[in-house]
Amino acid sequence: MTYTITARKTLTSGELAQIKELVAICNEQDGLDLKVNPGMLEKRSGEHEEDFVCYADGKLVGFLGLYVFHGGEAEVSGMVHPAYRRKGIFTALQAQAADACRRRGIPSQLFIIQRDSQSGKSYMERIGGEYQFSEYWMDLGEKQRATVSGNVLLRPEIASDYETLIWLNVHGFQMEEERAREMAENMAGDPKSTTHLMIVDDKAIGKISVNKDESKAFIYGFCVHPDHQGKGYGRQALAQTIERLVEEGCPQVSLEVACENSSALGLYESCGFFVKSANDYYKLAL
């Protein structure tokens, strides 16, 4: 069998449809819920080679995508058609992706591996990937949610809030300032996204963002400054955000949270979320 791998700076509508179909085939075969960030695939800048496609027998049989939020690492997600596995396709995709990262001076890759993917974990062991953390994808359920009251005001961001948002990213996510600025620039200007500041006593103490379209809303960038954690402010802000989205008629609300263990999910579960899937992240130095 022969196959061809090509690096792409942008993807055509046909390629996007083929990737969607490949994801569905792999998910059905493996009982997984692979994460490929379709929204990011649709909005590639065209500046860098970040998508790698493999064709054999006239169809797409493998895909690997790079997701670069800052210059310190590139997140990696990909898959190979069940009928074309164990033929070196993913290894070849990864080799091209690693070369693309090196050309950009990106020192490491962060692989997104579904918790139940035995093949993914075996691959990480084989190439020396080191476990870093886990993220839990959670959906808002129909059960009764806890009623939360308090003095947190959610205010939409304005242009003059830029430095405050950087400050919150640095302290709320323990992020280096340079990377916080780079991430903010990369994610700015998305018409589907809104960010609200958490205001207590006229001071910004946290933030929460929502990416929304006609069918779903995704909560992200949710943090509280360490000086104000443990006071219930995050719960208040999350509850207010959920209430607003439900009132707006949003049919599906989801979020992704990084936790060292599943017991840390209590805040989100108390607000009506349940765990749909989990991803483990593995780092590979280049």
Q: Model-predicted segments: where are they?
A:
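Short amphipathic alpha-helix that is part of the acyltransferase structural core
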Residues: 1-38, 148-177
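Conserved donor-binding loop and adjoining core beta-sheet/short helix segment
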Residues: 8-11, 27, 31-101, 113, ...
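Acyl-donor-binding surface of acyltransferase catalytic domains
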Residues: 70, 82-150, 282-284
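Conserved hydrophobic beta-strand within the GNAT/NAT acetyltransferase core sheet
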Residues: 76-78, 109-112, 219, 253-257
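Active-site acidic-Proline motif in GNAT/NAT acetyltransferases
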Residues: 81-87, 212, 225-227, 231, ...
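Conserved acetyl-CoA-binding loop-helix of GNAT-fold acetyltransferases
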Residues: 86-99, 126, 221-224, 230-247, ...
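C-terminal "cap" of GNAT-fold acetyltransferases
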Residues: 136-158, 251, 256-262, 277-286
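Glycine/small-residue-rich hydrophobic helix-like segments
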Residues: 182-248
